[in-house]
């Protein structure tokens, strides 16, 4: 951009800046805060030491945040690029934004971005995802009309347009999320396709994908950057599902001397993968790596990793697979990478990366490559006779998982991997207050990286502020709950806060749809019963604790009342129901609610077991959807 006064800025440049702003504004709340800047520099993979990045971010916040509210608005962002742009810091910032590799620019429009914005997408990602999906769905008869896709064309963006591939990929990542009976597979009219896309988006949201900026029309139009963004989230959830101690106890083999299981459990899946790779590298006598980008570009660490995890033929029924290390000494990086990938192919793991992706150190695709290796060949043995308290590994409850998925679907940052540990500095809770329209004064909030000394004090101050906001601004009932409880990760008391946040969010969504009608439990119950009787249905509910809800018949009837004729009653079991019947009804009900456009986070088990909190959210979401169609 040429030098110019702030007032003179062309539409093209404004569009470019909007695009750049959206890249940095990860949670799409219209502001950039310093942890989003940290993420940007991390993702841009720039050759800068950590202290330099911190310096740049401090300077950007200092120069850019002109009204000192602790965040950068779009106007302040424009100012950085114009007034500060000659400085080295602004140049580095601009470089970081442009460092999204393998970028294809194309014009695209979305309601949120201005007309004709330049959107970019990565050819490498498209190529990788197409090959992964082709393999995953190669035997699925429902996908024959689009699979196999050609990775070198735009097949992918057309293939997702009817919603079927997306629904199938969601079920591969989190089995049983979508009831197959709810997917429309024949006579695909525009209306029916719209329903499939609703089902895919609302189900993606329920497994923790951030889909706030994506509409069904974007997927139908096959907008590349949105399609790839959604697919990456779905694929990553599947790849990471088992990189978690309670689902994979052998990970305890990665414990270091003097480290407790509890400390290991706090690591994110990415950190565990790095720890896993280094465990095997150490055993091979090779140096450790610190990332899946710069440190793996020469493929040498990968050669050693493959050699360590390849089956040695010592277990029964497990054929030995020999890794040929001769390519290790190849002088050309690309040829060495190709040779390494040929060895990965022997393990059936040549996925996600091309030689060029390895050599360029593409962080996203290399992470996926390693996660897939871990899932196929973890090569870990659960430690015996060590002094380990295995009772800690209970895994999260259904309710905890639902809350976590809800938070992640709203795009909180950092991503919540472990409910209590990741809320101990209250940053996520404060972001959730913003989502429920409770203003947060970010200048009062301490943000990472926290100082080595007194880090916990900084986190505790945030927790105290979060509780104070809950009591005074949100008017939550927080009797006997203090900041210390959040900071300690007290499960019961943290859940009490989180539930009130989710409840308020659900009611807000409903009130927005119902032109501001205030919602209480009684109002929802009365609306449900009124709607059912008007539609001539015989079901009704007394309250959200009503045991008859376990059949899901009231939910199914309500969906049919909201969108007459959408329920196939041949699939619904009535009369004397077995547990399996109840579960099948509930599964169908939840998927159909999502298909008609209700963003339901609850799970079928919540209906079968009549969990009042989650039952409330189901009926509230349906009421919101019902009021929209009036």
From Swiss-Prot:
A Pfam family that the UniProt record links to this protein: CH
Limits of the EF-hand domain: 12-47, 52-87
InterPro entries xref list: Actinin_actin-bd_CS (IPR001589), CH_dom (IPR001715), CH_dom_sf (IPR036872), EF-hand-dom_pair (IPR011992), EF_Hand_1_Ca_BS (IPR018247), EF_hand_dom (IPR002048), Fimbrin/Plastin (IPR039959)
Residue ranges of the region described as Actin-binding 1: 109-382
Modified residues (Phosphothreonine): 391
Record keyword Metal-binding present: yes
Keyword Repeat: yes
Residues that, per the record, bind Ca(2+) 1: 25, 27, 29, 36
GO cellular component: actin filament; actin filament bundle; cytoplasm; neuromuscular junction; stereocilium
Region (Actin-binding 2): 383-627
Residues with the Phosphoserine modification: 268, 293, 326, 339
Domain of life (superkingdom): Eukaryota
Keywords: Actin-binding, Calcium, Cytoplasm, Metal-binding, Phosphoprotein, Repeat
Residues annotated as binding Ca(2+) 2: 65, 67, 69, 71, 76
PANTHER family: FIMBRIN/PLASTIN (PTHR19961), PLASTIN-3 (PTHR19961:SF32)
Assembly description: Monomer.
Chain's role: Actin-bundling protein.
Protein name: Plastin-3
